């Protein structure tokens, strides 16, 4: 599951707070060394990494996708290692048996932790930079880069691509202006994200087109999902500064078969959607393996 921009921003904020919290931890450690005080559990406990703010936060971080998981695991491991090295150094100083190796290990632990944080930040910022600015949804590039992975890991379900286009969107812009048109796009993006399941992702593909990656057991279930989305759009007016707008969408749904390139799947879904536009709009069309298109 690809994170929303608000989720990415919240994680980045917590990563920055982690640095600040561990500066405070270092000061507390220096104070304990000077005072010869080995009683603080956040420093000397064998599981001190789980007592700090960052340790508690990372334990509740999720859900994580397969690409993100290695970064978080490395960060968690480096965090534990840093705390362990800090504890061993402090106790060695307090008990007056420290060696240069204790300082070297702690320095390495600090550097490894900050490097792991930086790598995770870069990963998140890369995703963030490919988000659509207007809607906050992942954009076309994110879909291009993640589709093959999603297709390989869809089992035991099948992967379907739903291409949606707002009906007569040019008329909305011509009638109300582009600022209201932007409100329509942003609001629809929010609606679509809230109407899909956690493991399904909505993308802004371009203009007034959106793509939803749907996981379903069979064609019938995928078609029901498509019809449900179209009906929900039809039944939810969009509020703007001057009142309300009712919009509809036309959708084309196609199954993605193993090893199929994204452009092939989109091409099929686009043909189905175009057929829906030509036959009345505000409907969901399904294209099967034989390229037969039917309204669902």
From Swiss-Prot:
The gene is dgcZ. Substrate binds at residues 173, 178, 182, 195-200, 215, 224, 228. The active site is at residue 208. Catalyzes the synthesis of cyclic-di-GMP (c-di-GMP) via the condensation of 2 GTP molecules. May act as a zinc sensor that controls, via c-di-GMP, post-translational events. Overexpression leads to a strong repression of swimming; swimming returnes to normal when residues 206-207 are both mutated to Ala. Overexpression also leads to a reduction in flagellar abundance and a 20-fold increase in c-di-GMP levels in vivo. Required for aminoglycoside-mediated induction of biofilm formation, it also plays a lesser role in biofilm production in response to other classes of translation inhibitors. Binds 1 Mg(2+) ion per monomer. Its cofactor is Mg(2+). GO terms for molecular function: diguanylate cyclase activity; GTP binding; identical protein binding; protein homodimerization activity; zinc ion binding. InterPro entries: Chemoreceptor_zinc-bind_dom (IPR025991), Diguanylate_Cyclase (IPR050469), GGDEF_dom (IPR000160), Nucleotide_cyclase (IPR029787), Rev_trsase/Diguanyl_cyclase (IPR043128). It comes from the Bacteria. Its EC number is 2.7.7.65. Changing residue 79 to L: Displays constitutively high biofilm and PgaD levels. This is Diguanylate cyclase DgcZ. GO terms for cellular component: cell pole; plasma membrane. Allosterically regulated by zinc, which seems to regulate the activity of the catalytic GGDEF domains by impeding their mobility and thus preventing productive encounter of the two GTP substrates. Subject to product inhibition by c-di-GMP at a KI of 44 uM. The record marks 170 as: Transition state stabilizer. Zn(2+) binds at residues 22, 52, 79, 83. Induction: CsrA binds to the mRNA and reduces its levels. Expressed at low levels at both 28 and 37 degrees Celsius. Repressed by RpoS. It is an enzyme of class 2 (transferase). Homodimer. It catalyses: 2 GTP = 3',3'-c-di-GMP + 2 diphosphate. Mg(2+) binds at residues 165-166, 208. It comes from Escherichia coli (strain K12). Changing residue 208 to Q: Significantly decreased biofilm formation.
């Amino acid at each position: 599951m690809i994170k929303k921009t608000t989720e990415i921003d919240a994680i980045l904020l917590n990563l920055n707070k982690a640095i600040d919290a561990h500066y405070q931890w270092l000061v507390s450690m220096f104070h304990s060394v000077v005072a010869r005080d080995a009683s603080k559990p956040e420093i000397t406990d064998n599981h001190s990494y789980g007592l700090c703010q960052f340790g508690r936060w990372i334990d509740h971080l999720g859900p994580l996708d397969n690409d993100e998981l290695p970064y978080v695991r490395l960060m968690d491991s480096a965090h534990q290692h840093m705390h362990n090295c800090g504890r061993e150094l402090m106790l060695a100083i307090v008990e007056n048996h420290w060696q240069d190796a204790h300082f070297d290990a702690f320095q390495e632990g600090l550097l490894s932790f900050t490097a792991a944080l930086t790598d995770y930040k870069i990963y998140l910022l890369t995703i963030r930079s490919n988000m659509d600015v207007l809607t906050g949804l992942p954009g076309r590039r994110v879909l291009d880069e993640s589709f093959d992975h999603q297709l390989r890991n869809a089992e035991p379900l099948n992967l379907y691509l739903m291409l949606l286009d707002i009906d007569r969107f040019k008329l909305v812009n011509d009638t109300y202006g582009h600022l209201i048109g932007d409100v329509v796009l942003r609001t629809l993006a929010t609606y679509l994200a809230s109407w899909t399941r956690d493991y399904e992702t909505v993308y802004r593909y371009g203009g007034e087109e959106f793509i939803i990656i749907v996981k379903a057991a069979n064609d019938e279930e995928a078609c029901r999902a498509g019809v449900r989305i179209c009906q929900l759009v039809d039944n939810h007016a969009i509020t703007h500064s001057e009142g309300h707008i009712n919009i509809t969408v036309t959708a084309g749904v196609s199954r993605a078969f193993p090893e199929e390139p994204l452009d092939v799947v989109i091409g099929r879904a686009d043909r189905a959607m175009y057929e829906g536009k030509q036959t009345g709009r505000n409907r969901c069309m399904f294209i099967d393996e034989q390229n037969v298109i039917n309204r669902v």
